Amino acid sequence: MSVYNFKEVESKWQKIWKDNNQYKMDTAQTEKPNYYTLEMFPYPSGKIHMGHVRNYSIGDVVARFKKMEGYNVLHPMGWDSFGLPAENAAIKHGIHPHKWTMENIEEMKEQLNLLGISYDWDKEVATSTPEYYRFTQEIFLKFLEHGLAYKKKSYVNWCPSCETVLANEQVVQGACERCKATVLKKDLEQWYFKTTEFAEELLNDLDTLDGWPEKVKTMQKNWIGKSTGADLVFDIDGTDKSMTVFTTRPDTTYGVTYMVLAPEHELVKELVAGTEYEADVEAFVQKMHTMTEIERTAADVEKEGMFIGRYVINPLNGKKVPLWIANYVLVEYGTGAIMAVPAHDERDRDFAEKYNLDIIDVITEDNKMINSEEFNGLDASEGFEGIIDKLEKEGRGKRTINYRLRDWLVSRQRYWGCPIPVVYCDECGIVPVKKEDLPVLLPTDVEFTGKGESPLTTSKQFMSTTCPHCGKPARREVDTMDTFVDSSWYFLRYVDSNNENEPFSKELVNRWHPVDQYIGGVEHAIMHLLYARWFVKAFKSMGMVDFNEPFKNLLTQGMVLMDGSKMSKSKGNTVSPMDIIDEYGADTARLFVLFAAPPERDLDWSEQGVDGCFRFLNRVYRLVDELADVVKKDVEFGELNSQDKDMRYTIHSTLKKVTADLSEKFGFNTAISALMELINDMYKYKELDNINEAVIKEGVQTIVTIIAPFAPHLGEELWTMIGKEGSVFDIDWPKYDEKALVKDEIEVVVQVNGKVRGKLTVNSNISKDEMEKVALEDEKIKGLVEGKTIVKVVAVPKKLVNIVVK
């Protein structure tokens, strides 16, 4: 008997797949239905980790299974290859980011091929190549043309460690999402994408995503943060200016006793200019710039503020109330101003008590309005509507929907990102680069200092250009785009990755989208998944696509843990996939990550578990090797005895279960478990006397076919061992035989007073009455009920009989 040489087998089949371009998919094909399965593409760090192995193994099982089900399967891979690590490597090691990135891509690509993943490498994209980012730039220009990209000056999140601006989504509890440094505020002119333009669609269309985890949808709903209320206009006393405030409680407007502006609000500087308050206010504003959002707004942080010498007029009763600035009001939320109602808001009350400001109750405990003039006695809900009606008639307010979601800040002061394709002309202002002049290439003559302004400012050749409009000298934009821009449309490019004329063909992307199955970590719930959804809605509004959502179904796989902790280099608890592949083989590594836990749950690494999977694959190999000659025979079932029927039942019930686990849910672990039981039963069956060779043949062929998506190298090898030609993945997925699932005899449980007291083998067509009779006539049961009164007998057809006695 031969030995399973996994190294030889895996090397052999990887070469065959590559030489035959086995997984190339012509996206223009229309003969079969399409199925697009996609794992989130990685940043090319140079080494794959066990999280990658799990993610890509899940996607590969789906891709291979769907191909065998008769679909045209698109299963591409690429690289999210712009980003800070490459730039840091340039600073630290003196190697250009492009060289560092491309070397890492080649290394990771080789590792992915060693895993045996069925990628169509003809569709490969890398976001840092000019072939890709010229179209990222073209998309930017389309957004600019349609008013979805704009530039404005505002206070932004600044990471002093990364020395770049961050989007709101990249700040987690006041810290940089990447490096964990405390995030500060800076007043800068930056580029934005108008994500708020589609806030309502982003929110409402979550309800159409039945194939998404509720957790992810809830996270996005909370991030978008829809609030229904009103914008109220308060005139600033002694000026011709007014300020607008959004409130969800217009019914409390009579309780306003002071107003608060965010220290960074554009009105503050103007209102205190030349007054006795100017110097103190400026000092307070500067102090706020050194504090994080968490430090300013946490419930247990002391409220700080300052009166700025101005009053505003309540639009309902004409009363003047003092205008303050305070740490707990942020310029980026709402209008950057609040109407303070200390009687009915805890933060406002804390502030009012500290600074001795008035507190006026306007809502009673039973929700009735008081101290509210003509609205006294109304329910608060009635007052809500009545007050808005009054203010709308007077032009002092209007019903409004507000969102927590802010526009997406996309400017980054880094080198290794997509250049923003605009120039600045003293005559013409901001001018977009012409489409025919794309891509705007990253220069090579830059200095990587890691300090201050964008490295692009160090390239005079890059900076100096001519205006596309008037031809006079101009300077290029030196910021690059947030790398999340690149990853917000890559799934569309895969379908048409060699198109040199446009980002993608509308006809092709409509044919292949939305992506049928998207797989990646839950950590991308807010940023990547929200941005990708926004891009698709923007594209649809511009006529580039006809669908509303990028991803029909989403699986967020769990992490791979070591002793209950996340694997990380800093903890020294990582396991190298390459070491596992070298010692056990890729199929073993794949099988373990698929078998050890359901895909959406965290998986705890176990050397014993890996070894168990290795031994199982060897058992499969030995079984098929031993029975291969039988499989090659031309045999028929003939007359089947009970043991043959039992074996066929196991074969087809396993096939039914595995098919359901793969097509209806991601039950990889339970499918593999069923396969293991089938192998055990086949080993037992082959040792019996008078075995049926047709049953052996059917069992072995079924095993080879259904193990193939999980362990593709072994599947291919076993397929040839049983005398088959071509690839096992080119055959149709087998269909289970319903007749084989009908048993002549079944086992029923007999209970006495609810406790199991015996099991009986009976005819599968037995009636309820016959079940009761057989149970009562069983010698063991007779002894148990003797001398007792039988109260009742309950039979559950084909399952159990319960005899109640006293």
From Swiss-Prot:
It is an enzyme of class 6 (ligase). Its main location: cytoplasm. Keywords: Aminoacyl-tRNA synthetase, ATP-binding, Cytoplasm, Ligase, Nucleotide-binding, Protein biosynthesis. GO terms for biological process: leucyl-tRNA aminoacylation. ATP binds at residue 569. PANTHER family: LEUCINE--TRNA LIGASE, MITOCHONDRIAL, LEUCYL-TRNA SYNTHETASE. SUPFAM superfamilies: Anticodon-binding domain of a subclass of class I aminoacyl-tRNA synthetases (SSF47323), Nucleotidylyl transferase (SSF52374), ValRS/IleRS/LeuRS editing domain (SSF50677). The lineage of its organism: Bacteria, Bacillati, Bacillota, Clostridia, Peptostreptococcales. GO terms for molecular function: aminoacyl-tRNA deacylase activity; ATP binding; leucine-tRNA ligase activity. It comes from the Bacteria. Belongs to the class-I aminoacyl-tRNA synthetase family. The keyword DNA damage does not apply. It is found in: Cytoplasm. GO terms for cellular component: cytosol. It comes from Clostridioides difficile (strain 630) (Peptoclostridium difficile). InterPro entries: aa-tRNA-synth_I_CS (IPR001412), aa-tRNA-synth_Ia (IPR002300), Leu-tRNA-ligase (IPR002302), Leu_tRNA-synth_edit (IPR025709), M/V/L/I-tRNA-synth_anticd-bd (IPR013155), Methionyl/Leucyl_tRNA_Synth (IPR015413), Rossmann-like_a/b/a_fold (IPR014729), tRNAsynth_Ia_anticodon-bd (IPR009080). This is Leucine--tRNA ligase. A motif ('KMSKS' region) lies at residues 566-570.
